[in-house]
Amino acid sequence: MVCFYLFYGLNIIEKSKEIYGLTKYFFYICNVKLKKLKAMKVDNFDLIKKHINTSGEGEFYMLQIMRRSKDQKENGGKRKQTVIKSYFISSPEYLDSKRDEIVGLCEMFNARAYINLNKKSYKQVSLKALEILAGKIAHEDYNIKTLFESAAGQTGACDGNKSWLVDIDTKDMDVVEKWKSIINDAAPVGDKIIDIFPTLHGYHLISKPFNKQILCFGSQLEQIDVHNNNPTILYVNLKDSENDNESE
């Protein structure tokens, strides 16, 4: 009888261990999924709004809602990138007035909102559009549906206050701080970091232009990409966790 109870007790203990292990694994999986869901959303409206400033009606910031190739596959598996809508942001108030619409379109199309913090002028962009148009006509290309947007993308900061985008693909703040230090030590020496915005899997440093040769001193760190006229992420809330392999 003693052996029976001993065997029965050991069996219960083993079952309890099994249940505990399964429960622990279940909560681990739930935690991983929850972290992934949290990582799929970025809302930088309030951070970016303070950088929107124009001195006249002829100036704007280019904002586009885009479905990026890594967020969907269409046409038999071929990757495609689509611009859902473009906005010409003239003030922080105008950005605020469009916030719900922008968020709604991003949610509806599983898309991302990007904004270029190099301020544009309608005059400069219009002149660039004429230049592009002349080239298209010369080559008998009459597809001009995105002419103005293309011209805006090829036009720099209208006020001379250029900003660069440094894309760091890690959430490790020690790495981010080291890159900030390297950039500030680059010529011209001084504080060049304008702001830092979170992305899905890292950060965008917005900086003043610097000598890129100093980047070799960060070769042992997480690699970065430097862009002199690229947009930063304004809003994204991806629905599909398969798309979390991100590089903005």
Describe the function of each predicted region.
Residues 217-225:
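C-terminal, non-catalytic extensions of nucleic-acid polymerases
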Residues 33-199, 210, 216-218, 230-248:
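Signature for HUH/AEP ssDNA processing cores
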Residues 25:
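Cationic, low-complexity basic patches in intrinsically disordered or flexible, solvent-exposed regions
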Residues 10-12, 28-29:
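Short, positively charged and aromatic/hydrophobic N-terminal segments
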Residues 206-208:
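Short hydrophobic/aromatic beta-strand micro-patches
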